[in-house]
Amino acid sequence: YLVNPAAYAALGAYMFLLILIGFPVNFLTLYVTLEHKKLRTPLNYILLNLAVADLFMVLGGFTTTMYTSMHGYFVLGRLGCNLEGFFATLGGEIALWSLVVLAIERWIVVCKPISNFRFTEDHAIMGLAFSWVMALSCSVPPLVGWSRYIPEAMQCSCGVDYYTRAEGFNTESFVLYMFTVHFLIPLSVIFFCYGRLLCAVKEAAAAQQESETTQRSEKEVSRMVVLMVIGFLVCWLPYASTAWWIFCNQGSEFGPVFMTIPAFFAKSSAIYNPMIYICMNKQFRHCMI
């Protein structure tokens, strides 16, 4: 054991909790949407994509981590490490880019930067395809030699190699690519789109002399936007910041728990996503009930 056995028990219990909550909520999202035709709208396609991404994380990542935490190290070998790292990264990246597409969709629909634009099923499918292409552009390279997946933190799960500058894997360039393309750019797009969305709502409210209905609508949208941005930051900022610090300070001493705690926040997105993006959607909520 790298750390106290109690830490592995806590890790296993936390993974079990994520599976216990994450699987039913995301599966229910898929089921309810398929059962209720009125939910199958282009704008809801990306919410379904979020649920699929979260299920990838639950089934491909959390179950493996829970199993290996019982042994105190990653017992599934190189192939198992590659598979677990791939599916966990794929699910996380699909979710991340789904949030970007969702932000762009809402900006276009609400702010109307393109006059006479009507959001259709084809646009929704293009958004889904984009999120998958971007996710694969991050999760596949470590399988083919650009960086690699290695056991990380408490050695119970696998992730991209931020820790070493292993010869022949070009880990430095991949970390720079990931941090720029798969964190800073998505963060900038989300802040821009939701910032413009808030401004549009406030302008509309001012134009209507701040009626009670408009004020209530503005508050609902504002609350949703604030939660979206906070959810994104809570999930990804600790993990990205810690990974960047480790990359920039290779050779420094840090314990196994140092990277495990930020990973907890990133993995928790499988619960945050449906809570924020679906449970606060009145249509979904009414159909679930």
Curated annotation (Swiss-Prot):
Residues in compartment: Extracellular: 1-7, 68-81, 145-173, 246-257
UniProt key word Membrane: yes
Disulfide bond residue pairs: C81-C158
GO biological process, one term: G protein-coupled opsin signaling pathway
One GO CC term on file: photoreceptor disc membrane
UniProt keyword annotation of Cell membrane present: no
InterPro entries: GPCR_opsins, GPCR_Rhodpsn, GPCR_Rhodpsn_7TM, Opsin, Retinal_BS, Rhodopsin
Gene3D superfamilies for the chain: Rhodopsin 7-helix transmembrane proteins
A Pfam family assignment: 7tm_1
Protein modification: Phosphorylated on some or all of the serine and threonine residues present in the C-terminal region.
Alphabetical UniProt keywords: Cell projection, Chromophore, Disulfide bond, G-protein coupled receptor, Lipoprotein, Membrane, Palmitate, Phosphoprotein, Photoreceptor protein, Receptor, Retinal protein, Sensory transduction, Transducer, Transmembrane, Transmembrane helix, Vision
Transmembrane residue ranges: 8-32, 45-67, 82-104, 124-144, 174-195, 224-245, 258-279
One Gene Ontology MF term: G protein-coupled photoreceptor activity
Stretches assigned to the Cytoplasmic side: 33-44, 105-123, 196-223, 280-289
Annotated membrane topology: Multi-pass membrane protein
Marked site (Plays an important role in the conformation switch to the active conformation) residue numbers: E84
Residue numbers of N6-(retinylidene)lysine PTMs: K267
Motif ('Ionic lock' involved in activated form stabilization): 105-107
Main location: membrane
Subcellular localization(s) per the UniProt record: Membrane; Cell projection, Cilium, Photoreceptor outer segment
Family from the record: Belongs to the G-protein coupled receptor 1 family. Opsin subfamily.
Described purpose of this protein according to its UniProt entry: Photoreceptor required for image-forming vision at low light intensity. While most salt water fish species use retinal as chromophore, most freshwater fish use 3-dehydroretinal, or a mixture of retinal and 3-dehydroretinal. Light-induced isomerization of 11-cis to all-trans retinal triggers a conformational change that activates signaling via G-proteins. Subsequent receptor phosphorylation mediates displacement of the bound G-protein alpha subunit by arrestin and terminates signaling.
Name of the protein: Rhodopsin
Gene that encodes the chain: rho
